[in-house]
Curated annotation (Swiss-Prot):
Keyword flag Disulfide bond: no
GO molecular function, one term: structural constituent of ribosome
Name of the protein in its database record: Large ribosomal subunit protein bL36
GO cellular component: cytoplasm; ribonucleoprotein complex; ribosome
Keyword Transport among record annotations: no
UniProt keyword annotations, A-Z: Ribonucleoprotein, Ribosomal protein
Lineage: superkingdom: Bacteria
SUPFAM superfamilies: Ribosomal protein L36
Lineage of producing organism: Bacteria, Bacillati, Bacillota, Bacilli, Bacillales
PROSITE patterns in UniProt: RIBOSOMAL_L36 (PS00828)
Family of the protein in this entry: Belongs to the bacterial ribosomal protein bL36 family.
One record GO biological process: translation
Organism expressing this protein natively: Brevibacillus brevis (strain 47 / JCM 6285 / NBRC 100599)
Length: 37
């Protein structure tokens, strides 16, 4: 999980979602998981 000020999809499988007001990227590749904060 990377925590970044700006989250962007890295590959085609990355999805940008909102969970409890947090913007997150979820992906099949665990290295692509990101969280805003």
């Amino acid at each position: 999980m990377k925590v970044r000020p700006s989250v962007k999809p890295i590959c085609e499988k990355c999805k940008v979602i909102r969970r409890k007001g947090n913007v997150m990227v979820i992906c099949e590749n665990p290295k692509h998981k990101q969280k805003q904060g």
